[in-house]
């Protein structure tokens, strides 16, 4: 149940979400993606991993998860970037160029990761049973639908709304598979969900863009 809940509630915001949003909306969407990532990964580290651990070892929240979250390189990078933006500090052009080159690696790395996950599972082993169908329903219909409704209620429009809806329609976060293996939960179910949702994402997003 813990693995199922994590698969339904959190998405792959960076490895798939960032390159997807960048291609769709341009680099101006990056701050919105990073903000979503910060909230998304906070939920993963502080709630999602506890659910998976509860489903596997029978444990729950561990204080070490907070330390792990705060020392994650991506989280540190996001927090530092917020400080730079609010203080108006400009980094040297050479360093900015280096960061841009590193950013350009995200898309090919995401494709490699996606291919590796699908290869590890094997297309013949991908079976859409009832539980996985429910995950797909949450991942690509209910969660984006709720996000759209919340945007309407709170008056969120424009690029911010588009990024939020696309990000919530991203595949199952691959960390679910890693956590399931680490804590003795249903790793096969998590891996199949990650692979199927990644494949489905490339069909769902074009349809979603027509609606947006």
Q: What are the roles of these predicted feature ranges?
A:
Residues 1-212:
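Alpha-helical transmembrane segments of multi-pass small-molecule/ion transporters
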